[in-house]
Amino acid sequence: MSRIGKSPIVIPAGVTVEVKDGIITVKGKKGQLVQEFSDVNVTVEGDQVLVERSSDHKDHRAKHGLFRSLISNMVVGVSEGFTKELELVGVGYRASNQGQKLDLALGYSHNIVLEIAPEVSLETISEKGKNPIVKLTSFDKQLLGQVAAKIRGFRKPEPYKGKGVKFVGEVLRRKAGKSA
């Protein structure tokens, strides 16, 4: 049995969970999330959500822990929310935002303008002498990770000088340059 899958999910106060016809809906103060599920049985008992697999088939065992984690992330998201911070490391790298539009100067001949989904709140922090930081906040962990990965993908950190867009706290594997 999956160690992750068999542990129950505790529903905090202010969060409602509804299960109907293979669709789970989680509502909270931050928003509402809907997820389709298959091959597992989801039941709500009091202030707990239990995820059980329908059989011991290989596919069902694989999805047991997955759906438990997805539902757990939904519950945490609508109650507390998630945050990701990206740091722009490099000379002349800048970030600014106008509403939900993120404007990035990453050393290309043109600026990159990215329209951010309305579910993700955007904030840019630029302090003199420090690297600019893009702070993303959302109740949907999947969407947040997707947006953050897209921004990071515009200029991935390179291993020699460490220049590029990286997550705050991310440890980069550095390489030594050519020895003269």
Curated annotation (Swiss-Prot):
Domain of life: Bacteria
GO molecular function: rRNA binding; structural constituent of ribosome
GO biological process, alphabetically ordered: cytoplasmic translation
A Pfam family reported for this protein in Swiss-Prot or TrEMBL: Ribosomal_L6
Cellular component terms (Gene Ontology): cytosolic large ribosomal subunit
UniProt keywords, alphabetically: Ribonucleoprotein, Ribosomal protein, RNA-binding, rRNA-binding
InterPro entries linked: Ribosomal_uL6-like, Ribosomal_uL6-like_a/b-dom_sf, Ribosomal_uL6_a/b-dom, Ribosomal_uL6_bac-type, Ribosomal_uL6_CS
Function statement: This protein binds to the 23S rRNA, and is important in its secondary structure. It is located near the subunit interface in the base of the L7/L12 stalk, and near the tRNA binding site of the peptidyltransferase center.
Family in the record: Belongs to the universal ribosomal protein uL6 family.
PANTHER family in alphabetical order: 60S/50S RIBOSOMAL PROTEIN L6/L9, LARGE RIBOSOMAL SUBUNIT PROTEIN UL6M
HAMAP family membership: Ribosomal_uL6_B
Subunit organization: Part of the 50S ribosomal subunit.
Protein known as: Large ribosomal subunit protein uL6
Organism: Flavobacterium johnsoniae (strain ATCC 17061 / DSM 2064 / JCM 8514 / BCRC 14874 / CCUG 350202 / NBRC 14942 / NCIMB 11054 / UW101) (Cytophaga johnsonae)
Gene (name only): rplF
